[in-house]
Each structure stands twice: as C-alpha cells, then as structure tokens.
Amino acid sequence: EPVAAFSIGSQLLRFNNNGLLGRITALVGLDIERLTILDKNGIANAKITPSGLLKVLGLPIGVNDLALLTPNDLANVNASVIDLIDAAINAGSDSLLNAGVNIAALVDLRAYLAAFQIANIKLPLGGDKGLLAVISAGGAASPIGAGLDAAIGLGDLVRTHLVAANGTNSVALGLGLPGILDANLTVVEPPRNAIGPANGQTKARSAQVRLTVNIGEQKNVSTPG
C-alpha cells in the first residue's frame, strides 16, 4: 500500500532570530541562525527515515522485528536533535535519500548543537506528544510496515523537536509598553510530522500558537508633543 509522509506547522516557527523559534532558542543561548542552513541549498533536502533513526538509536532488533513495530512501540522510543542529525549523517551514503546533501555541514552543525541541553533532550518518536504522528492501517497496535521507510525532512523534525522540548513555556515578544502592555506567545501544540497510508486517513494538525496580551492600569499616560 502506498505511504504518505508530510509535515505541517506555523509560519512563526521558521529558523530565524525574529520568529518564535528564534526566541525560544535564544533563551538557552542557542543561535538560531546556525540552523538556517537546514533551509538552504546543500542541507535543505536532507531526509531521514524512521527505520534509519531506529538503527542509529541502536535498538536491539533485527530486520524482521523492525517490520513488526507498531505506532505504540514508537511511543516508547526516544530521540534527541543530536540523534536526528546523526541519522541524516549516517544516511549520507544513500544516494537516493540524500543526494547532494552537504554532510560536512551537518557534522559541523552537530558539533555546535551538542553543547546545548535542549538539543540533547530525548522525546518520544510516537504517541500523542511524539515527533511523528504515525498512522497504521490497522490501528495503533498494528505494524507500521512500509511507513518506517518513508523519508521525512530533517529540518522539519528538528523544528518540531526544539518546540516540543520547550514545552508550553511563553516567550516574550518585546512588543509591549512598560507598565501598560505585555505581549507573549505560547506554543500550545508543536508542528507535526505524519506518516501513514496514502488513503486520505493520514492527517496531522497544524502547530497552535497563542498570543496573550496583558494590559495594565496606568492613570496618566502622556505622549511627546
């Protein structure tokens, strides 16, 4: 059966300093500009597969057992941003999956990110809060099958991981007026990456971003004439 794989998320979660993701990483000292290479020529096409990631994670299972994994099984497997990049580097020799990808640039990016805790936090691959929304034709307890070989963009997975690792923490926008107005953005739900049968039943919900504006009381407000 044909397999579909796609990602969906908010435009506010781009790799740039002015966006929400840039403000999230700035809180831990990570320069989001270093990750913009994931959107540029040479790395933008970098992809990994769930099966390739599972091999990098060193799961003690054979090829036959891999084919029997279910969405429920993936909910019990955790991966970090470093693991995701390692999977892309490991897949560098696959001319079909990563043709033309600058592996040296990925190695440099990994070296930079390794020093940051947020890039080493491990999150579930599957489940309601997982990096992947994996849909099996027979349900969550049925084998994923060919879905494990579906190619997913590395940049999409890294973006999802960084947002999910931040949880639902608010990020100040710096657009307010002291004592009058404060504006904060909160990621209610991170972007999702979906894998499943190409039968119209494979779906993913977009990232939800909530804007909160607090208006304080101030009796005397004057503006320069």
Model-based region annotation:
Residues 1-25, 149, 157-159, 163-225:
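Short, conserved structural patches
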Residues 65-174:
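Primarily marks folded extracellular/lumenal domains of secretory and cell-surface proteins
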Residues 3-92:
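Charged, amphipathic alpha-helical linkers/stalks
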Residues 2, 50, 60, 71, ...:
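Proline-rich intrinsically disordered, low-complexity coils
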